[in-house]
């Protein structure tokens, strides 16, 4: 199963960098949750998004803040 980040202009290098950060520094549950929320799972050629409702206690503004810290602020997340 391939996993693609939900950022519209995220480069492969930046995404791999984020994955390396999560694996090198023992990731906490919050990091894993926002990674899941902002990624698409591509199964059998079809894109399926993970439901935001899986983690209802994480406010979108909090998630945005975390992601903008990790990635360039000129990258706009797709939140629907």
Swiss-Prot record:
Superkingdom assignment: Viruses
Descriptive protein name: Uncharacterized 9.3 kDa protein
């Amino acid at each position: 199963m391939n996993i693609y980040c939900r950022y519209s202009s995220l480069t492969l290098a930046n995404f791999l960098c984020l994955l390396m950060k999560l694996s090198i520094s023992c990731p906490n549950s919050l990091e894993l949750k926002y990674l899941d929320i902002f990624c698409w799972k591509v199964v059998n050629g079809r894109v399926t998004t993970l439901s935001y409702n899986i983690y209802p206690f994480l406010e979108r503004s909090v998630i945005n803040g975390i992601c903008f810290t990790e990635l360039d602020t000129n990258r706009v997340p797709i939140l629907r």
